[in-house]
């Protein structure tokens, strides 16, 4: 038989049996194991827990208890909600049971009426099958409904679409409402109300028949969710769905952040658009210059108004040209370069001497080789100094060809031009600070002299092998056609930033030396500093030092660029920007380019004609004030700092002209009209120190400097005894040497001396702040609404260590050379002192210079020892047949004595006198 209906575990919903059920005791239904009856109390009603505290339930009972709790979660409801969930389809349960089991279930659910209706409700099973049991069940329940007015059993309906008993036979699976689709739930309207379980003996039920995968389906909800489907409150469901589907927009994030900001956003500086003619703008630009315009300034201003009056006005499209200013205003000729003329002329003369040209003398036969320029004179003296350098090894082998119409001339020979040692120079080193214009000037000179540049920059792989493969073939001999000699450009090899080498650039300098030695092309190297270059390349005749031009001339050039791009700014602002960036012309142009794109609107080309038929162009004037957005080093007093800091609260130049952006730093600027000046100054100092300390500690604390030296540098009266115990322990650990049993060897140079002014690259306020900030226990509140900033660290030594990483002594290549200079003495040279022992040298020299060679010697000795041992065992008989004396004689003949063999036998003995086993 099959029972389909709604189950409810709430027996109190039946008013007829409420009085009778209160006096009864609940009998838990066990599955395969019986449980002792538990009295039905208010706490453990229906599926109550055992009242015995401390008693451990068996595993089967615990699992049954969990299952009961789970069922209670879904089927227990209050009295008020019972009416609302009377027609709830989520409680639909379909069970397929036998006739005898159905009688037992009916006796459990209806113990009062079981004696009267047992014979009529559930007759004995017939042999006709399961359909007869189902029909009898439905008929008896319907007939019982008319006799019995109790709402124990409500009306039954068939759960299939055909509403016929025959279709119930096809339902062979038990369906839990969780695995049923929505359509099945809507068509199912059967109600079956459970009642208090009766009987004195717990009944044993079979294991539930779980649905198969074929009969399962996902719950699908329509656009609107029906509250009757879910047993839990609707409010929690809406919150859960909102958390999954809702996302804060970007505007909401910005608005919430802006609302929490203490500092109000400044109003955006409005730009004023003017209609002006190019001639008036050009005149205004000339009047703003401090000096008479230099050639490179005239080149920039020619974009506004051409210098030749006969030239028409095609300059308007060039003014509207888009792109980076560093490319837009890049020089195209030597006179357009913003640099000293001496440096430019030296490079240009050198490139002219390296250029391949035809011989100027007509007496030279046609078959002779093409020589260098006329600036190089051939040496007429037949006598040469033996120590002089032979240029024939470096001069290119050039094979000349006749015209294509001529026949092959066997007289075409390979000749080599002869140069003196002073005239030979096929490489040059150009130095200068970053952004001064080294590369742009080189490209301008090469473009003017018809040179093609082959550039190798740090972004490329520059190992020795790859460098020779890339440009090695380019530097070898080549064939030049006479008819195409003037039209063929020469080639210049440019090695950019040779002072910046990475780990993958192994063998770079060896490849450069080979390249210069065998190259037939001129080679130019650029660098920012010469401290890390080999000494062989630091020859004064081959170095061109780029120096910055005067600040007034640089200001004129920047102002001309701004006027050429139709941006009108006061000269004082340009001076402050140039003072901030120094000689970095590229950084100035990039910063102003970004600022102009943010602050100035895109100006369309609106041409208007006046009486003179001269077109109008639009220019903008910005309220760019001095000292805003850039650091002004001329600030000396606290009042100046307060005034400047209040103006610089928006940060850099880009943030200054984008006030609509959120100031993520949340700088607190107190209101001057509500507080006194001293209170404002105190809060400003704390805020400034706190912001500076965070950035400084984050940047500098990654290193591991020595604290003791820092104390000596910062305080002359400080000593090792004045330090705290923890600080002294850290100092001892910092001074722990890699040598076993030896303290740190003090550096004989200026490590313990106070730093020079040029070595201390710290701002004044940061230097003063480091001395006194971390001695304070905490910082005060810096905002008006009592918002506390994070407390500063109490560890003063922490910040002093960060300071030592900047001002600490760094190993200099000259110091290494001076220490190891005695190794370069000739054998015939007699010294008046004994060479120092390696243990007396600085620790860095021992680790970096001596240890690799010792390891190499040890490796080589062990390889030789293994080879001789293999040789002893391969002479037709095994090594065990050779006597010890014979083996010792063979090894002794190879140079191995007894002490050396003992030294090499132990793998940990080597270097144990110098290093620990962990550092070996």
UniProtKB/Swiss-Prot annotation:
- The SS bond pairs are none
Q: Which GO terms describe its molecular function?
A: ATP binding; ATP hydrolysis activity; DNA binding; DNA clamp loader activity; DNA clamp unloader activity
Main location (coarse class): nucleus
User: Compositionally biased, Basic and acidic residues: which spans?
Assistant: 17-29
State the name under which the record lists this protein.
Telomere length regulation protein elg1
Region feature (Disordered): 1-65, 112-131, 357-411
The entry describes its oligomerization and partners as: Heteropentamer of elg1, rfc2, rfc3, rfc4 and rfc5 forming the elg1-RFC complex.
Q: Which organism is it from?
A: Schizosaccharomyces pombe (strain 972 / ATCC 24843) (Fission yeast)
């Amino acid at each position: 038989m099959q029972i389909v209906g709604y189950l409810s575990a709430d027996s109190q919903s039946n008013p007829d049996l409420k009085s009778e059920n209160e006096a009864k005791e609940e009998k838990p239904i066990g599955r395969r194991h019986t449980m002792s009856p538990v009295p039905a109390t208010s706490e453990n009603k229906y599926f109550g827990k055992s009242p015995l505290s401390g008693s451990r339930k068996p595993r089967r009972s615990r699992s049954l208890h969990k299952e009961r709790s789970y069922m209670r979660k879904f089927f227990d409801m209050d009295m008020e909600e019972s009416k609302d969930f009377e027609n709830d389809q989520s409680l639909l349960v379909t069970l397929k049971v036998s006739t005898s089991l159905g009688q037992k279930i009916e006796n459990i659910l209806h113990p009062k009426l079981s004696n009267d209706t047992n014979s009529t409700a559930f007759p004995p099973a017939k042999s006709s099958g399961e359909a007869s049991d189902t029909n009898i069940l439905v008929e008896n329940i319907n007939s019982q409904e008319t006799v019995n007015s109790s709402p124990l059993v409500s009306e039954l309906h068939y759960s299939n679409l055909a509403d016929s008993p025959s279709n119930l036979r096809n339902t062979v699976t038990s369906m839990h409402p969780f695995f049923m689709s929505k359509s099945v739930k809507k068509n199912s309207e059967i109600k079956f109300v459970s009642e208090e379980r009766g009987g004195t003996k717990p009944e044993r039920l079979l294991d539930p028949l779980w649905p198969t995968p074929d009969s399962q389906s996902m719950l699908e909800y329509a656009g609107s969710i029906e509250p009757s489907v879910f047993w839990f409150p609707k409010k929690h469901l809406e919150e859960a769905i909102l958390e999954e589907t809702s996302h804060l927009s970007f505007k909401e994030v910005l608005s919430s952040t802006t609302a929490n900001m203490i500092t109000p956003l400044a109003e955006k500086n409005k730009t004023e658009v003017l209609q002006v003619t190019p001639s008036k703008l050009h005149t205004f630009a000339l009047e703003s210059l401090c000096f008479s315009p230099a050639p490179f300034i005239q080149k920039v201003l020619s974009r506004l108004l051409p210098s030749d009056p006969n030239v028409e006005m095609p300059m308007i499209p060039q003014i509207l040209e888009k792109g980076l200013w560093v490319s837009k205003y890049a020089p195209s000729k030597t006179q357009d370069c913003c640099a000293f003329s001496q440096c430019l002329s030296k490079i240009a003369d050198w490139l002219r001497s390296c250029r391949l040209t035809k011989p100027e003398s007509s007496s030279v036969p046609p078959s002779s080789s093409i020589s260098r320029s006329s600036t190089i004179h051939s040496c007429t003296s037949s006598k040469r100094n033996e120590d002089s350098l032979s240029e024939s090894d470096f001069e290119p082998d050039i094979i000349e060809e006749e015209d294509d119409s001529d026949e092959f001339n066997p007289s075409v020979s390979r000749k080599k031009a002869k140069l003196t040692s002073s005239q030979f120079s096929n490489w040059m080193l150009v130095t200068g600070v970053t952004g001064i214009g080294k590369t742009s000037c080189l490209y301008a000179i090469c473009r003017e002299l018809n040179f093609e540049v082959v550039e190798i920059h740090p972004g490329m792989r520059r190992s020795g092998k790859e460098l020779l493969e890339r440009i090695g073939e380019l530097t070898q001999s080549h064939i030049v056609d006479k008819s195409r000699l003037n039209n063929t450009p020469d080639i210049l090899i440019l090695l950019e930033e040779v002072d910046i080498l990475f780990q993958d650039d192994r063998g770079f300098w060896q490849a450069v030396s080979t390249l210069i030695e065998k190259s037939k092309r001129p080679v130019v190297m650029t660098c920012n500093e010469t401290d890390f270059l080999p000494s062989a390349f630091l020859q004064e005749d081959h170095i061109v030092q780029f120096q910055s031009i005067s600040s007034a001339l640089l200001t004129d050039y920047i102002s001309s660029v701004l006027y050429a791009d139709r941006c009108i700014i006061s000269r004082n602002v340009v001076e402050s920007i140039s003072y901030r960036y120094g000689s970095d012309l590229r950084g100035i142009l990039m910063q102003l380019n970004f600022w102009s794109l943010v602050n100035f609107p895109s100006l369309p080309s609106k041409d208007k004609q006046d009486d003179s038929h001269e077109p109008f162009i639009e220019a903008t004037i910005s309220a760019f004030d001095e000292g805003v957005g850039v650091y002004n080093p001329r600030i000396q007093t606290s009042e100046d700092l307060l005034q400047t800091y209040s103006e610089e609260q928006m940060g850099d130049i880009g943030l200054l002209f984008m006030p609509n952006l959120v100031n993520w730093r949340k700088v607190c600027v107190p209101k001057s009209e509500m507080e006194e000046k001293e209170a404002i100054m105190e809060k400003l100092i704390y805020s400034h120190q706190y912001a500076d300390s965070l950035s400084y500690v984050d940047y500098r604390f990654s290193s591991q400097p020595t604290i003791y030296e820092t104390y000596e540098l910062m305080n002359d009266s400080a000593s090792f005894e004045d330090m705290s115990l923890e600080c002294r322990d850290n100092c001892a650990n910092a001074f722990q040497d890699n040598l076993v049993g030896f303290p740190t060897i003090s550096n004989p140079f200026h490590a313990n001396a106070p730093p020079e002014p040029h070595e201390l690259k710290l701002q004044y306020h940061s230097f003063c702040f480091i001395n006194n900030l971390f001695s304070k226990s905490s910082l005060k509140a810096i905002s008006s609404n009592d918002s506390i900033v994070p407390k500063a660290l109490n560890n003063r030594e922490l910040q002093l260590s960060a300071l030592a990483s900047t001002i600490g002594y760094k190993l200099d290549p000259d110091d290494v050379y001076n220490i190891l200079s005695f190794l370069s003495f000739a054998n015939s040279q007699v010294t008046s002192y004994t060479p120092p022992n390696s243990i007396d040298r600085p620790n860095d020299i021992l680790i970096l210079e001596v240890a690799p060679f010792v390891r190499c010697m040890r490796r080589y000795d062990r390889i030789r020892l293994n080879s001789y041992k293999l040789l002893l065992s391969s002479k037709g008989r095994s090594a065990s047949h050779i006597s010890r004396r014979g083996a010792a004689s063979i090894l002794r003949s190879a140079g191995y004595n007894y002490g050396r063999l003992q030294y090499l036998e132990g793998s940990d003995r080597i270097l144990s006198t110098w290093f620990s086993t962990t550092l070996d």
